Structure formats: structure tokens, C-alpha cells
Amino acid sequence: VELHQRIVSAPVDFGAIRSEFGLASAYPAEATAAARDAIDAFAGARADRTDIPFVTIDPPGAMDLDQAVHIEHTSSGFTVHYAIADVGAVIDPAGPLAREAGVRGQTFYLPDGTVPLHPPILSENSASLLPDQNRPAALWTIECDENAEPQRFSVIRATVRSRARLDYASVQADADANRLHPSIAALPEFGKRRIEAGLARGAIGLRLPAQSVIRDDKAVGHWRLVVEPRTAADDWNEQISLLTGMCAARIMLNGSASDSAPSVGERIALLRTMPPPAESAIDSMRRTAAALGVDWPADQSVGRMLAGLDPNAPATLVLMSEATGLLRGAGYTVLDGAVAGANGSGAGRSAGAPSAGGVRSAVGAELEGDSRSAGDSQSLGGVGSPGGADWPDRAGSVGGVATSGGPGAVDRKGSAGTRGGVVSAGPGGGRTGAKPTSNPQTVNNLQHSAIGAPYAHVTAPLRRLADRFATEICLARCAGTEVPQWVRDGLVPTAESMKRSDSLAGKVERACIDLTESTLLAERNGAIFEAVVVREANGTRPAEVFIADPPVVGPCIGAPPEGEQVQVRLVAADPTTRKISFGYPI
């Protein structure tokens, strides 16, 4: 079925969702004052790298600009300079702003506005990498070979200056017209080679239609539900964040920059991890592929099979949706105080608990993507596009609840509840009394299985709490200094805050989509729609169908055949309960 957009709008009030989930838009006055008066604690010790012509790539209108990039093709491969807003330099770790950020966990994007991690005066002004402004940054330098594999990498504190603010659509248009900004002229080739490297590692990338709620400019208070376009430029750009997160994880696990000898001291890390999928889940997916007539050679990985599918075939939607079930169990793993061993073992600790153990939040599938896209965005299947450095974690099966933050979670932002952040109940846990775990962490369970390597969140500190802490560890390791005590004290509370906020973000995001779907369809009960059956009924749950016009996904009564295009009838759409249902046959 052709996945297309159509303008369908209705009046939707998201205030009830804010109230239901306790999202307070106002920032405490004391914390706001701290943000207003924030100064760069490392102003006198920064490298001046304002000579690098950085650019930012973000959704139109975004002001919380975490990342600025410059990439060049060299005689030996590629050199990536990636500047990340240095939030740790402008927040007093013992002050009111740090305490409030610890409670919030991450920024919440709803269709009608944000609930920010930090006050806008900081996140959208003084700490944001806005064009033509000198800004403090954590500057990553990553030297890659011709295959875009990292050879040397490190991070330092620097002053940077962005030259231009770009968006994904314009970057794609410029790439198509062969007129890319010089600072990112090498991005397409670099991105393609990184994507290929990911497939070689066993990475899994999903391409599912992403529902977005956007404002209807022609009708006050009305909102539209559309399929969010995703460009190749999105994929290329997220590869930079993904690469940076992989380098960050290696620095934390090795205890040093890439060109230094691995440390034999304490291993301190905040990793984004995901366990490998069960073989039974892969076997089930192979049976589904066979039933749909999709050729899947026995020696071909899941990622390569998915990458080779026809994006417009109904079977692709079914398999991509089922693949979300392979990407479950994403969470944060804290290592603190372990002595790194030759086999990669080290002590881990659980979030919010004084006893040891790896942090693993059961939040389902995750992928990276920018949570600030043009509206509340939910990928069908609860998963954003995989691939990049920060995919927002998404969870669940088709139509299921999404989670936050992604393989990484990649960093495309949305202006409304889209793959984004959270307000949580506050920090929990602490370092006091922590004991080594009796189950040493292994190389396998320190990995992010969707990425095929260890990974960390370090590229979105204006919007996600974990990134500030992981970045500080990397800065200390590369400088050869001790990791600050406030960072070590905050690792477990931060992981716990992220776990809570991820869960809440998914619920809020799903609620915004459900409310919009049910409101748009409320006057169309009994109407007949063309649909693709993305999941058949199994006796314990109904079938699930995707409607392209308007783009909705919902349960279907009856037994429609999986992977087929059928006609279904809308039998229920209730904005009060935020539920919709279809029926088959009509």
C-alpha cells in the first residue's frame, strides 16, 4: 500500500494529557534563576576551536541545538569534528538546576509545546549551539579510515562557533542538487559507509512509518496526523551521533582516549545497553518471512534482510513491525569501581539500588531518531528508525507504547511529545554501600545489540540527563584526570531517573497519538478504509492494521490475513477512552 499524507485535522486538547501524567510546564523559580545566571566553569581552560566551520542539522524551528558537525574527507579517510553543548560546565552539580534536572530526566515534547529538561533560557539560548555565537562545547575529534571505521578519537573542552543552522529536508535537497554546505560535503559518503559498517557488525535498522501530530495552520486549535517523512540525510546524520556514542563507550570501558594505553584502574561508565534477541524470536521472524514469500538466506543477518526489503511492499511493514520484538530490554548499565579485566568484566550496579547489578530498564525496542520532529511522533511498532546514534528508544509492538531514548536513541527532535523526554519522580539510589556484583559484566551484556557494539548516550545533553554524566566521564578519561565525585555519586540516580522518564515519555507519546487518532476518526464510525494487516490475531490479542489515510494503526476484530491489503470498517473511535477499533470482513 502506498504510504501517503493527507490533510485531516480536528480540534484536539492535549491539556488533559499533561494533567493526567502530571507534567508541570513551569520551571521552579530557583532553578530558573540558576539557569539565567549560569557561567562557564571552564572558560579559562578551553581550546579555541572557533576556526572550525561547524553547522547544525535540526528540525525547522528547533532552538535546543545540542550538536554541531564538521566532517571532511582526508587522504586516509574521514575526520569528524562533533561539538556537543557543554552542559556540565554551566550547571552547578550541587545547585537547584541540577536537582530539578535530576527529577525531570529529559525533555518532553508534546504537540502543543515542551516540558523541558532545562529552562529555555539555558537550553534554547546560552548553552544552545546557535549560529554565529561562541559557545562552550565538548569537542569530539574522530579520525576514521576509508571505511569510516574509527582509528583515533578523543574529546576535549573547547569554544566553538556554528556558521549555519540547517534542517534535514534542506540538507537532503542540497545533497540531491550536489550543493551541500562545504562543512558536510563528505556527509553522504561517510554516512553510507557507516551504515554498511553497521550491517557488517550485525546492527538492525528499522524503517517504519512514523506518525506525527502537527498543527493545522489553517484552523486554530486543530491538529493533523501525518506520516513523518524520513530522508537519507536523517540516516547519514544519525550515524555521526551513533559513532560518537560508540567511541564514548570505548573510552569509558578502556579508561582512556583511543591513543592512550588502556587503564588498569577503576572502570567507570554509564552505558546504553540492550541484550541480544532470543533465538526463538529470530526463528519466529524467519517463519513469518517464509509465509510472506520473502527470501531470507540462512546465512543472512536480520539487519541485512531488513535493509534489502522493498519499502513499499506490505510484507515489509509486517517484518519491520515484527522486528521491533527483537529490540527489547534497552536500559542503562552503570559501572563504578570495577577493575577492568582482560575479558571486559567489571562490577555493575542497578539503578536506584545500593546493591550491585547492571541497570536494565525493560522498556522494549529502541532506536535512535530526533525526538524534536514536527509534532508528537510515534513510529508504527513503537520504534523509530534504527540506525543512528541516538535513536529514541521505542518500545512495543505495532501500535504499542514507545520508550525514550534510543540506541541509542539518535537525535532528531520533535516539537511535541515525539520520541522524547520526561518528568519523573526524582532521583533515587546512591553510591553509599554499593557492593561488587557476584555476576561480572561481560563483553556481551555491555553491548547494545541493535548497534552491535558498546554504546553510550553523549550527544543530547540539553535534552537528556544521562548525556551530561557520560560526557564528564569521557572528558576526564581523555584528560587523564579523576572522574569528578559528583559524577560518580550521580550515576545510579541518573540511570534510575532515565528509566522512569523513559517509561513516562512512552506513555505520554502514545496518549497524544491515541487522542489524535480517536478524535480524527470520531465522526467516521462505519467508514471503510484500505488497510495493511501488520499482525494477525493469535487468540490472546486482536489483529493489527495500518491505515494510510489518515495514517493510523489500530486493533482489528476478526481474522484478516497478515501481510495482505484488505478493506476494514471502523467500528469504534472514542476520544474519551482514546481507543479505536476496526472490523474485518466489512
Enumerate the language-model features and the residues they cover.
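Electropositive polyanion-binding surfaces
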Residues: 2-352, 391-392, 398, 407, ...
